[in-house]
């Protein structure tokens, strides 16, 4: 495979263009904002979302979808979850059966509760029989763009496709593991953002390392329960797309979702926090969908439920933590 189209000019899309450019002779990066696209062409830098990281010379920055998709063999989307359906609908006239579609978005669609790979299939199914994969794992865009060692997962129900993409994407500092469980991978990448808000609360309230360890461990138990109920494999959540991503997002200072929790613990209002952010904290948007999925599959997710109560119904961060501590006692597997 020689031609790659990356849809999304945020920090993650830009980082993917930088890290994957050595692997593909032709790379096009679609950027929504025309003025930003023009500056990126001139300066070879995304000064809004990933300043200080230079785009390789042969990465072509475009602002029009037809130009981005023309001749592409792989379409890799790295856009906020709430934009995926609409953008794929816009792209539909320019797509063809030979293309492979890869989602790098971590989130769920509110209302339908679909995972991102399911949204892509839903849009394309009447016209194409799409080959779809997902990439996910513990990845901060800045570290990827700096060529710091990173490992993640590429998952598809088509094991051969996952292995092809593993070979196409892997490089000296970007190691991919093939996986045949997109359900587990996508649920891990989505629900960890909700748990990370709780981790931010723990940090922001100064509750200590014991509390953080408990939050991460019980959060992983919740993610695993939901993924298994939906048909995913428990072992997936013990890997990069589960435990790995959860630890990074809960503990790393670059985590936007963790930052939301920290700021809430410091007394700021959610609306103020979100409006001040350049990039989306997916956990804020995902919390409702996770709660709805839990009810649909009769799975108990107490941490996710308290994050919903805090984000949507206004209970205080300290009360959310205390409610978790006051729950009825049970076995660890419960």
Ranges and model annotations:
Residues 1-53, 58-63, 90:
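NAD(P)+-binding Rossmann beta1-loop-alpha1 motif at the extreme N-terminus of oxidoreductases
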Residues 55-70, 74-147, 165:
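Rossmann-like NAD(P)(H) cofactor-binding subdomain of soluble oxidoreductases
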């Amino acid at each position: 495979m020689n031609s790659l189209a990356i849809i999304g000019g945020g920090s993650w899309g830009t980082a993917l263009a930088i890290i994957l450019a050595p692997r593909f002779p032709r790379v096009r990066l679609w950027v929504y904002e025309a003025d930003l696209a023009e500056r990126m062409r001139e300066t070879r830098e995304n000064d809004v979302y990933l300043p200080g990281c230079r785009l390789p010379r042969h990465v072509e920055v475009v602002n029009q979808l037809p130009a981005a998709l023309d001749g592409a063999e792989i379409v890799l989307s790295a856009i906020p979850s709430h934009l995926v359906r609409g953008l794929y609908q816009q792209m539909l006239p320019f797509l063809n059966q030979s293309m492979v579609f890869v989602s790098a978005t971590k989130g769920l669609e509110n209302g339908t509760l679909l995972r991102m790979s399911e949204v892509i299939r839903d849009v394309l199914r009447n016209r194409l029989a799409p080959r779809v994969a997902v990439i996910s794992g513990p990845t901060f865009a800045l570290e990827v763009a700096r060529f710091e060692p990173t490992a993640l997962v590429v998952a598809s129900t088509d094991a051969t496709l996952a292995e092809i993409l593993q070979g196409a994407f892997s490089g000296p500092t970007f190691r991919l593991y093939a996986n045949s469980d997109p359900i587990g991978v996508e649920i891990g990448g989505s629900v960890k953002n909700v748990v990370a808000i709780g981790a931010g609360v723990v940090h922001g309230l100064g509750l200590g390392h014991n509390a953080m360890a408990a939050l991460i461990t019980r959060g992983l138990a919740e993610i695993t329960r939901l993924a298994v109920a939906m048909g995913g494999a428990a072992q997936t959540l013990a890997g990069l797309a589960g435990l790995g991503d959860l630890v990074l997002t809960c503990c790393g200072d670059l985590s936007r979702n963790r930052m939301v929790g920290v700021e809430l613990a410091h007394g700021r209002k959610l609306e103020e926090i979100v409006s001040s952010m350049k990039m989306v904290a997916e956990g804020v948007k995902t919390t409702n969908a996770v709660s709805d999925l839990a009810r649909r599959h009769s799975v108990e997710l107490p941490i996710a439920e308290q994050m919903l109560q805090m984000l949507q119904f206004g209970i205080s961060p300290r009360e959310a933590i205390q409610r978790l501590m006051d729950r009825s006692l049970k076995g660890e597997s419960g």
